[in-house]
Amino acid sequence: MGKIVGIDLGTTNSCVAVMEGEKPRVIENAEGDRTTPSIIAYTNDNETLVGQPAKRQAVTNPKNTLFAIKRLIGRRFEDEEVKRDIDIMPFAITKADNGDAWVEVKGEKLAPPQISAEVLKKMKKAAEDYLGEPVTEAVITVPAYFNDAQRQATKDAGRIAGLDVKRIINEPTAAALAYGLDKGTGNKTIAVYDLGGGTFDLSIIEIDEVGGEKTFEVLATNGDTHLGGEDFDNRIINYLVDEFKKEQGIDLRNDPLAMQRLKEAAEKAKIELSSAQQTDVNLPYITADATGPKHLNIKLTRAKLESLVEDLVAKSLEPVRIALKDAGKSPSEIDDVILVGGQTRMPLVQQEVEKFFGKAPRKDVNPDEAVAIGAAVQGGVLAGDVKDVLLLDVTPLSLGIETMGGVMTTLIEKNTTIPTKKSQVFSTAEDNQSAVTIHVLQGERKQASANKSLGQFNLEGINPVPRGMPQIEVTFDIDADGIIHVSAKDKGTGKEQQITIKSSSGLSDEEIQQMVRDAEANAESDRKFEELVQARNQADHLIHSTRKQLDEAGDKVPAADRGTIESALSDLEKAAKGEDKAVIEAKIKALAEVAQKLAQTAQPHGDPQQAQSNSKPNDDVVDAEFEEVKDNK
């Protein structure tokens, strides 16, 4: 059985880790980095770039470079949060046929799970390169406050990437696993404050140790799935745009290229202001008008940044209060505060968290890697490699059904430990009613319409008797991934109807299978592209070395031989610009053969074997170049 890897599929960055014996290890990607930007770009050459290569070309290709896709996963186009993003994202967010929020790139509509799968594929490839074996199973993390549709969509992304998702685990819980694995013994209650690129979670977790076995029990969780570093960046961007408009009278919001440059500059300024008191945002040639080019140069102080985002930090503390109340704990009863997510590096965030809890947060947990490490630990538990660890997570939102008068009747309360199962008996609202519709809801409001609709199904064939007589037993079953299964049974007739919740949105199995097939087809075309690039690199190397030898040999080369070599060089240069690998390889062979004479002419006193080898494509050099090209895919 292969390894089960742990993947933190983040809004801004993603990370993959695996257990090596009893120790988790973060795996570097092809570029040698421990985290990978969750950015996907579609180039004019029909190439898909993921991670740093995609980020590098974002400024010149803003409409086809997709980032923060996690904010759209499992969401409806009509959601308020999506409407806010439509105004600020340089790429097109569009409405899918099923009402979901999708993205349009080059006239093609793409589902968020399909896009996220590209990031997961890169994580999978990094793990395979490191382990030297295929990776087919993973534990993937999600924000604790993700609803059922968002969890389903994340699992779909895993399937499209060719991964069997063994478990969906909540990010703060994963961070607690990473923290608790090597932070000594004893019982502790910890708060995990997880402010990432696009989401915020707060979980109160109890770590108990009995007889060497550690139990991680989530007491309560709360959060905001649309609050994160991207929102902090947007505050800076809006400030810079407004300042520039005041100075120059030009609104940069209508210029996607300028907005992409501003996004990069805002992120850079935010990071710099975590250690410096002031930074210059300097973007020459940001735009132009009839009077000529315009340059943006604005000073930004830490104090100004803090004034721009202080309400966002304050907003994050409200879920903290609710989670503490739900857990029955006061801030003073929390033993340790763990900060997770890159945005927690901001001094203001650290100060406010310290002020709230009355204690300094721990600094010995890497905020970028803890979640992936925890996912790897859970992978080790599922594989049987990690013993004596028990994880008890909770469902973040209450679950119930709509009953008479448009009321939500709750069957499973929020913060119930999962997996769990709960049944309740309902009856009909009308005389002689032969069917009932079970409308499944998730949320905390009493008014059914104010909660998230997860879907509905019918139970038919009920005996036509006076209202209130039939006994319909509705059962909710939540699995360890937090995914919901619902059944309804008429106790009178024994008829039963059951479904795994597929929200009215989401991808159908057929759509997922099609996306899996597309991904496999792309993998084949990617392989052919890489082979073509390898052949071109061999050609470039041979052309360069042959020209160099031809120049050095000068008049020593007979005119007839020079003509033959020049002709072979020209043929290879022409072939290398084409798309046919076989033709390029044939021309490489032809040039290598005629270049042997040149090598002998250029080095008449040298080792003939050495001279001959110099004229051939140098496999080592080519492989290095080939790897570099592959990395950028």
From Swiss-Prot:
Output compositional bias ranges, type Polar residues.
598-616
Q: What induces it?
A: By stress conditions e.g. heat shock.
Listed PROSITE patterns: HSP70_1, HSP70_2, HSP70_3
Q: Where is this region: Disordered?
A: 598-633
- Tell me where in this chain the PTM Phosphothreonine is found: 199
One protein family per Pfam = HSP70
Q: Do you know which InterPro entries this protein is assigned to?
A: ATPase_NBD (IPR043129), Chaperone_DnaK (IPR012725), Heat_shock_70_CS (IPR018181), HSP70_C_sf (IPR029048), HSP70_peptide-bd_sf (IPR029047), Hsp_70_fam (IPR013126)
Task: Give the family, as the similarity comment puts it.
Answer: Belongs to the heat shock protein 70 family.
Q: What is this protein called?
A: Chaperone protein DnaK
Q: Which gene encodes it?
A: dnaK
